[in-house]
Amino acid sequence: MKVSKDFKFYYSRDIPIKYKIKLCTLEGKRNKENAPETVDKWIEKKYLKYSSLYRDTTIDLYITCTLYSDGKQLSTSEHTSYNPFSVSNKWDETIIFPLKHQDLPFDTMIVITIWDIYSPMKKVPIGGTSFNIFGMNKIERKGKHKLLIWQDREGDGEKETTTPGQIQGKDEQYRLEKLKKKYDRKLINHCQWLDKFSLNEIERLSRASESLNKNQIYLTIELPEFELPILFKQQNCPLYIPLSQTQKKSLVLINDIEMDEHPSEQKYHRLNLYDHKDLKPNSTELKGLTDILKQPPNTKVTSKEALLIWRFRYYLTNNKKALTKFLRCVEWSESHQKNEALSIMPKWDPIDIADSLELLSSAFTHKNTIMVRRYAVEILKKADDEELLYYLLQLVQATKYEQFDGNPSDSPLISFLFERSNKNFILGSHFYWYLTVDSVLKSSIFCSHYKTLQELYFRQLDHTDAQRVNAQNKFISRLSLLSVELKAMNITREKKIEKLRIMLAEGEYKDLSDFQPIRLPVNPDIEIIGIVPEKSNIYKSAKSPLGLKLRTTKGEEYGVIFKTGDDLRQDQLIIQLISLMDRLLKKENLDLKLTPYKVLATAEEDGIVEMVNPSEAMASVLSKYDGDILKFFKTHNPDADSPYGIAPEVMDTFVKSCAGYCVITYILGIGDRHLDNLLLTPNGKLFHIDFGYILGKDPKILPPPMKLCKEMVLGMGGENSKHYEKFKQLCCEAYNILRKSSHLILNLFALMVDASIPSISDDKEKSILKVQEKLQLELTDQEASNSLLQLLNDSVTALFPVIIEMAHKWLQYWKA
């Protein structure tokens, strides 16, 4: 204890007691304005009704608390135990941190996040707050504090926190609350008769304030109190070097439990910042560097690997694949490392466009990485509009990681997308609809971000393009109203189809049968002028999608399916990836006759799908042609002089398309395959539709690794035919070509992890790892081919009479 003339206190360095706080109560109501209006509207999201959005009574929440200093985590996160609340959200639980009072730096901050269990696999933040342990006068805070909870975000531990728990106020309520704290701590003399009136008045003002701020929530915490105040004082460093207590003159070995984490890494960087410009690795170090560079993108670099890359950074400037790894090693909050990285970055060999996508991911969101993101955009500018369209969906997602405050020119990526989209309406139309969908996602916390971007982009359009977008919006809105109205009718499907045609021909939706040219949102290359009423249809499905024939300005008909109540964002993503893979294969002169039809989500549960005509479900083909695909091809494309009596180009197309889709569905983990979502065209193309299950998910037990059904093999002439041998050869060739573009594929997936697509966002890291696992990047091309052939052989074995248990289960998969 230290004593001055007027003030007695303890030094914090003299308190060897673990720091603890008490979590008391949560007050106020959560802001639900962004929530869906009813649970029934989103009944498919079966867990949502159990979350805090739909329960006005108490809910089972839990809290995590972490200590931060200088923007870095000091301790592990401590959390409250399970507590089923019955009346109010009241914990009254003490959290004990592993650090003692004497260990706490002056800028130590408590970062608190309140969590709600959204589903068995997902948690969402109710809100977060942060609170400095020491006041500006260096005295440790104590007693009860009422902290503002910043809703729908985690507590922020940065030095300039975005979730301050205490906001300085100037009103009477704020002044009285400060006085009440002093009163509770007996820093103000008590006067019983006067205190009664004062406390009642404070209570009245508090209730009035709560009614004004009804959508704010507060957490009350209680900090430890001691007999005397605690003044911050650091431990003095020893001025001598402790010697061994033994008399022997020998080295003393000390076990450093943190050795694997390299606690001296930062100092090493400082001491070696401008060294090693001419240093070259030896054989062992070179192998280590080579192994690191072979790692997939988004792989976390260990401390040991980071030191190796940092040491030979100048040597690596000639290797364009090394730049992203080097930038991941940089501690961007450290000014010396930031300056060194930014100075060496322009000297590096320019990276590929595929690698530039990694620099736009969530790994580079620190305020000091703005130049890294700007560099990535400069690389991206090399892509033409056709190539850019293949990445546009992910680039729109990457805008959420930009430092954007409403001015597009401050963000290199946003300004680039605006510029390119303004120059090309095909690009601009897709850009607009991607922004539109993300601006209305109720499951996303980025709605306002995308709404702002959408409005800013629309304002920048010239008069012609603005009219085009307005026409698209009106067309989609009218289709949506028509679909909803038909769904509400309590009549048979046949009657609904009849009603649909009447409504389009002469009813209230007659305007949809004839209008001024509109760029079709799903394919802006096409201009449409109306719907053909007599060819309109409603498909047999729970969602009752509309089948429409659209008249084009070229006098042709273009078929689309308009869906309401169906989230097409996942299908849109998979079709985009299939289109990209088709392009990658064709660049290597391998055309596998894929059919990447077009899909566009126009709202969270609305969208348009291009129809592929003519085409027919495999189940229907087998039913009509005695279970024989060859009969189907022979009927439409006979050639008496060719094997099986079928035109050679048709068989070639069938074999190639089977190979392409087998490999792609394997890499993407497409599930729930059956004969109704495999389609055939008369000219031999096979293609897949409906991608509700991806990344290995499947409603059926033990799905086969390769989506190859018996009918496909028989359609090639059987497993011993030359066509099947060619099929296997094409599979291996396609697989290795796509493996070479693994960085591009994985980077595109990484940019989608925060897109609120459940199959990906439910487990972000695992989603990317599942694709990475299928690519088998650790294998050589020959090893990868052998692995794929083994999978094909296992699948074929399962399809034909071989008595093994697993084969039987895989055969049942296709029969289900």
Curated annotation (Swiss-Prot):
Catalytic activity: a 1,2-diacyl-sn-glycero-3-phospho-(1D-myo-inositol) + ATP = a 1,2-diacyl-sn-glycero-3-phospho-(1D-myo-inositol-3-phosphate) + ADP + H(+)
Chain ranges of the PI3K/PI4K catalytic domain: 532-800
Molecular function per GO: 1-phosphatidylinositol-3-kinase activity; ATP binding
Pfam family, one: PI3_PI4_kinase
Domain C2 PI3K-type: 39-186
Keyword Lyase attributed: no
Enzyme superclass (EC): transferase
GO cellular component: cytoplasm; endosome; membrane; peroxisome; phagophore assembly site; phosphatidylinositol 3-kinase complex, class III, type I; phosphatidylinositol 3-kinase complex, class III, type II
Record-linked PROSITE patterns: C2_PI3K, PI3_4_KINASE_1, PI3_4_KINASE_2, PI3_4_KINASE_3, PIK_HELICAL
SUPFAM superfamilies in the cross-refs: ARM repeat, C2 domain (Calcium/lipid-binding domain, CaLB), Protein kinase-like (PK-like)
Alphabetical list of Gene3D superfamilies matching this protein: C2 domain, Phosphatidylinositol 3-/4-kinase, catalytic domain, Phosphatidylinositol 3-kinase Catalytic Subunit, Chain A, domain 4, Phosphatidylinositol 3-kinase, accessory domain (PIK)
The EC number(s) this enzyme carries: 2.7.1.137
SMART domains, per database record: PI3K_C2 (SM00142), PI3Ka (SM00145), PI3Kc (SM00146)
Residue span(s) of domain PIK helical: 275-460
A biological process term (GO) from this entry: phosphatidylinositol-3-phosphate biosynthetic process
Region: Activation loop, residue numbers: 688-709
Keywords noted in UniProt: ATP-binding, Kinase, Nucleotide-binding, Transferase
Annotated segments matching region G-loop: 538-544
Residue segments, region Catalytic loop: 669-677
Family to which this protein belongs: Belongs to the PI3/PI4-kinase family.
Protein name per Swiss-Prot or TrEMBL: Phosphatidylinositol 3-kinase VPS34-like
Organism in which the protein naturally occurs: Dictyostelium discoideum (Social amoeba)
